Amino acid sequence: MVALLIFLGIFTCVETLPLSDSPSSYIPEEVPSSQTADIGLPPPTEFTLPNEDDEILIRKLNIQKTRKEILYGPSLIGKTSFFISGPLGDQISQRDQTLWSRDAAPVVQAVSHDAAAALHDIQIHGGLQNLDDYKILYQGHWSSSVPGGIAKGQFSNFTSDLLFSMERLSTNPYILRRLHPHADELPFAVDSKIVQKLTGSTLPSLHKAGRLFLADHSYQKDYVAQEGRYAAACQALFYLDDRCHQFLPLAIKTNVGSNLTYTPLDEPNDWLLAKVMFNVNDLFHGQMYHLASTHAVAEIVHLAALRTMSSRHPVLALLQRLMYQAYAIRPIGNNILFNPGGLIDQNSVFSNVAVRKFATDFYPTVAGPVRSNYFEANLRSRGLLNATHGPDLPHFPFYEDGARIIKVIRTFIQSFVKSIYKSDKVLAKDWELQAWIAEANGAAEVIDFPPTPLKKRKHLVDILTHMAWLTGVSHHVLNQGEPVTTSGVLPLHPGSLYAPVPGEKGVVDSLLPWLPNEQKSVDQISFLALFNRPQIVENNRTLRYMFNSESLLAGTVRAVAAANERFMEEMGHISQEISNRKFDDDGLSQGMPFIWTGMDPGVIPFYLSV
């Protein structure tokens, strides 16, 4: 409840921020179509390329003015990308913070009400006396803040090894990689008799066959847990079983204290605690990785565009749509999430200091590069897609859903780009677009951006598709409503351990000492529920309506509007399929013992919502 009180207090402060120093500034409450809306001018009614604009001098003067008023400021929350700055940049950020706060207000109120009811019920029950009691915290509660409820199967199957392993291929697919038979060494040893009994094979044989996978959180051993909280720094080995054709866990190594290695053949409580310890590390990774891989990347690419393209440019208009409220998140996060004593310090095993270190360490090489993080390129680089050194994954929910969604996004972007540029030659002559590419590679310091000059329309399609993927899909797989419904559901996914990592096996009679108590549990659920935005379904701000912007469509040719109609129709079909998922005769959905809907286009926002 302390978290909610702090959130409400900061929310009130942000809500009262002025939109501008000038009372006459035109700053719309809805999604801005272009930067003209930000500087007090009505948005253009038609978008044009610079070499087709009859008012080219005015256009150039506006860009010059914008470059003086939108600047690169210091990074926020670790050393990642520059944050928007300057007189106009500050105004844009304040506007976004105000819009964000208005959206947050009903969520905060709903969470506060839901939390009080959940805490009351568990206290009436007599507290958490066993693991099944954690269901009481959820069942019949959180209907206002999390109306879709908890993912089916998360309670009934929380001890399942298949559930644990398949979460690596759905709720957080960004830490897993296949071990290459030659380029990668085995990360740690596992007793050969245990491996044989579990897999029917040997560790070297699995490695050689490309059937061995690693999720490595050993970097977290450098982080200092907060007082009264504890964490391991787990590495987990997974394997493809050629007998049952499933992706399963093999071993978990803690890398702290006695550095124990756990396997599914250990005592049930020992093994379940090992999975909980891994999930503490994984929940921290997912939440902090999303910050560096989506917010920091999308912002800097867009910021470079703001400084180089006219408000009349159709590409900037599209980017503006995608970046709705984008410049609210890092400053608000800096003030209420990652500040000393803030929400992260209250709910996570590690403090805000670790968050900043994570962002600083991961952004330059893992989370920040653009091209190497294109959807399929990223999966191929980790051996999860089209691997040449091992068999295909029998089920890969993240890819299965993501591939369909990104195909629909790409199809719209292709239509959009072709409607603007009739040929590659036309694109090559667009000096504003080329200035954007040069700026991104230069002053903006975007990592691994397509090189200048941009010569092909397909390369622009790649950039814009990736931006839409980051803002409308990738972000929500790790954040938004996903943690409260799946990846942060108790008792399997606590934000911290509350007892030291065991120094030996066979001493865990109950997991309760390591898990959050009643109050801490309600605090965790409340904290994660604050990220959810259920109201976007009613006001058509879901992924399905990503490009359904009146100003964007009115300012472009009819072909773009037609492409948007097809986009909404296709996303509607995907949404219907995902929302209607059920368990098959084996009690599985997409090969998992829980139903995952984290990419439902009819539920997730089209923008960086939190």
From Swiss-Prot:
Residue ranges of domain Lipoxygenase in the record: 47-610
Q: What is its EC number?
A: 1.13.11.-, 1.13.11.45
| Cofactor binding comment, as recorded | Three His residues, the carboxyl oxygen of the C-terminal Ile or Val residue, and a fifth residue, usually Asn, ligate the metal, which binds water to form a catalytic base Mn(2+)OH(2) for hydrogen abstraction.
Q: Which cofactor does it need?
A: Mn(2+)
Which subcellular locations apply to this protein?
Answer: Secreted
Recorded hits in PANTHER family, A to Z, give: LIPOXYGENASE
Name of the protein in question:
Manganese lipoxygenase
Q: Record the organism.
A: Fusarium oxysporum (strain Fo5176)
